[in-house]
Amino acid sequence: ELAKVVAAAGIEPADDPSNRDDRFDRARIRKAIAGADWLDVPALAVSAANLADADAALEWAAAREWSECVTKGPMGYTYRPQAPRAVALRVLTRIVTELDGSVPRGSAVARLFESLVARQPASIGGLVARAMPDGWSVTKAPVRRA
């Protein structure tokens, strides 16, 4: 459908053969959705809008948690988590991104969170995190000598 809209606008649509390759989840899912006559498209649009609202609320809460519970020190950040898990994951993601320069995978941040809750040290990217008495400390990992 999008290709038709783009073509009608006078733009040549890109053709990515992997979009039709069943080895990829996205191709299989698109085929399944296309054949699902029971799918209520307007209800999906409402659900998507609700998810966008929830995402905005989580972002707002994470920004507030950051300003109230995160301090920057000479070696990294200390985070004194007060918010629910979903918010804390976003705060940890921001800390890792700020220190490491790249956005970590969600599953890696979730593992980091679980380790810190269990008061176990953990690493993510080039960083090390520890549960300290005054909060969670996230710093650059020491340089390894060869």
Give residue ranges: language-model regions.
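Catalytic subdomain that performs nucleotidyl-dependent activation
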Residues: 1-48
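AMP-forming adenylation/ATP pyrophosphatase catalytic core
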Residues: 46-146
